[in-house]
């Protein structure tokens, strides 16, 4: 019988096991995200950018025939590609985090486990 409203020893042991597994899985996920290359393209595909699953910029590609476009068009396309890559990267990260924590009801601050 657990006293003072504390969980019994078996529940506590199980909670520690889950926490340790989450920690190991989180490290693995962090490594996976770091090694991902997520591509974003401008609408006309003249600019492509790649960022990691951790939203770090990796590389940029500009179609050679696009280099003669006006400055504003180039800037607009770069921004489009960056936004798309960032959106894909953050979506991927959220999905992977949900896979990691979804069934555990952790109620992490700033993270909705029911958000899909």
Curated annotation (Swiss-Prot):
One of its GO terms (molecular function) is DNA binding. GO terms for cellular component: bacterial nucleoid; cytosol. It comes from the Bacteria. Keywords: Cytoplasm, DNA-binding. InterPro entries: YbaB-like_sf (IPR036894), YbaB/EbfC (IPR004401). HAMAP family: DNA_YbaB_EbfC. Homodimer. Belongs to the YbaB/EbfC family. This is Nucleoid-associated protein P9301_00191. It comes from Prochlorococcus marinus (strain MIT 9301).
